[in-house]
Amino acid sequence: MTTTVATKDRILRAAEELFARRGFDGSSLRELTSAAGVNLAAVSYHFGCKEKLIEKVLRRRLDQLNTQRMAALDHVEGRPDTTLEQVLDAYIRPALEISYDVGGECFMRMLARAFAERDERLRELLSQNYGHVMRRFAAEFARLLPHLDKVELYWRMDLVTGALTLAMSGFGMIQRAENVSEQAHHEQTTQHLIRFAAAGLGQGGLARHTRQ
């Protein structure tokens, strides 16, 4: 790793940790340069400004996540024998695996904080750069669940994503048992979430009620 690449990576890791603790708006470049052991000129050279740095921190893992999701979806998309569980596996497993990576927990805390604070930068980034990924999954879910209209499908996808976000945070009620390996616990989490999501997505459409 060259000195330039090492410096850039050090800034990104320090920024991720700082944003997880303080949020995007609560973090200053002075704090960042101190944590990364660099000067302000290095941050400006590699990223230009704080907004660009935030984007790079987010995209560093989100690009990887969505590349893996699309690769997994490629294997099952459009096939007559594809099951709902297989498509959910392509959506869920890559996200959980990234959350288990080194630094993944910190990234998830940063992401959860941004969601909780309703950060519009995150919403815009997801829409502009990863909207096509969600549309591909939505199209495949729609193919497998023709009884759902578009609005109902998107509601259910949104709730599945919420459950996935909780699982990625590792902050749920279910903790790893002492006699279960970490790898086995991760697989249990994946399988339980896929079954839960399949039940929620696949059930019949809701009855339409009219007010009297």
Outline where the language-model segments fall:
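N-terminal intrinsically disordered/low-complexity leader segments
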Residues: 1-6, 77, 207-212
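An amphipathic alpha-helix adjacent to DNA-recognition modules
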Residues: 8-13, 47-70, 74-77, 81, ...
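Helix-turn-helix
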Residues: 10, 18-52, 56-60
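Hydrophobic alpha-helical connector segments
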Residues: 71-105, 157
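Amphipathic alpha-helical segments used for helix-helix packing
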Residues: 86-88, 99-128, 171-173
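Short alpha-helical scaffolding segments that buttress acidic/His motifs in well-ordered protein cores
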Residues: 91, 95, 108-115, 160, ...
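C-terminal peripheral helix-coil segments that are non-catalytic and often amphipathic
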Residues: 128-212
